[in-house]
Structures are given as structure tokens and as C-alpha cells.
Amino acid sequence: FPVAKARALSLADADVDVGDLERFSRFIAAQRGDAPALVGGYGEDRRIYAKSSLFDGMGEPRTIHLGVDVWTEAGTPLRAPLDAEVHSYQVNDNFGDYGGTIILAHDGFHTLWGHLAHRSLDGLREGQAIAAGETFAWLGGPAENGGWPPHLHLQRIDDLLGNRGDFPGVAPRSERDRWLALCPDPRGLLV
């Protein structure tokens, strides 16, 4: 996975519309330049979400990003950072959602891998063992990843709260501390 030479990216103050895929993709490409990937976003208060009805629910807008994003090419293979087993998986196919999603169970926590190619879910089964270093998924393009420029949303989750195949990736500002405690920084899992 191309994170060793990646550039840092903050979307905290980015002036892009998440509903305008073409403009958002140009912004990401310009930020990336010749780097293999862009990495960042954990704990950011992203005003780009406040501009979108996708993240406002029925009350306070959700703007606190709970995972780390790795912006790179569709089709990029993903390898498990640690031994795991498949907890759950599904296609979350609403616009702005995760698209292909896999949740892995590790020793004492889970990881959510979002914006995946749908083929990543082919042949998976709950309880399936995934060895550290094993390729288990691929990044999806906009047609299958929720309508985003290609990227991985990686989120560590200490308690799934009963969820299967999905979990909030963005939280309201007023609940920032609670959600970040539940979803610690996953950057150490990037390999």
C-alpha cells in the first residue's frame, strides 16, 4: 500500500463540494501531484460535510471524521495489517456512503475498510481468517464506492455497538470526544 511516500492531506478547510465528483477529483489530483497517495483526516472537523445534506441527518450536522483516508488509485490492493477474521461485510450503496465495506475483527478491536470495489466482497464469509499481509480487498471507483474519488476509509472501532457491515464514519461536533474515544487513531495500522 503506497503510504510510505504519501503526502499529508487535511480536508478541514477544503472548499470542495462532496456532491461534485469532478471538482472533488480535480482537487484530490492537484493535492496528490506525483505522490503515490494522500493520507489524513483522523479527527478532522471537515466543513465539507456541513455543506452536504448527506451528513446532516435529522439534527446536528456530522463533521468529525472518525477514520483515516488514503486517497490513491481505484484497484489498489489492500492487505491486512494484522491477523483478523471477517466480522461482517456489505455494500452500503447510498450516495456518499462507503460502497463496498468490510469489517475485520482483530484481538480486542475491529477495523472498518470502506469505499471498496464490490469484487472485494465476492467469496467472503463471516468468520473467515485473514492473515497479516494477505490481500483481502481492492479500492473501488466512484461507481461502486459511494460516489467518491477513489480512497480508503480505514477506521479502528473498539466497540461496534451491535453494528454489522456498517458503522458511522463521521460524528457530530457535540459528541466528538465520545466518538473519538470509541474510534482511536488508526494510522498505526497503515502498512
Q: Which ranges hold each PLM region?
A:
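Short, glycine/small-residue-enriched coil/turn segments at secondary-structure junctions
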Residues: 32-34, 58-94
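Acidic, glycine-rich catalytic/binding loops that coordinate metals and/or anionic ligands
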Residues: 2, 122-134, 138-144, 148-191
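Gly/Ser-enriched beta-turn/beta-hairpin loop segments
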Residues: 46-66, 92-109, 145
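Short, conserved secondary-structure segments in the cores of folded domains
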Residues: 74-77, 120, 126
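Zn2+-dependent peptidoglycan hydrolase active-site motif and core
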Residues: 80-120
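Polar/charged, compositionally biased leader and regulatory segments
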Residues: 1-69, 172-191
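Histidine-centered active-site/metal-ligand motif
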Residues: 65, 106, 115, 151-153
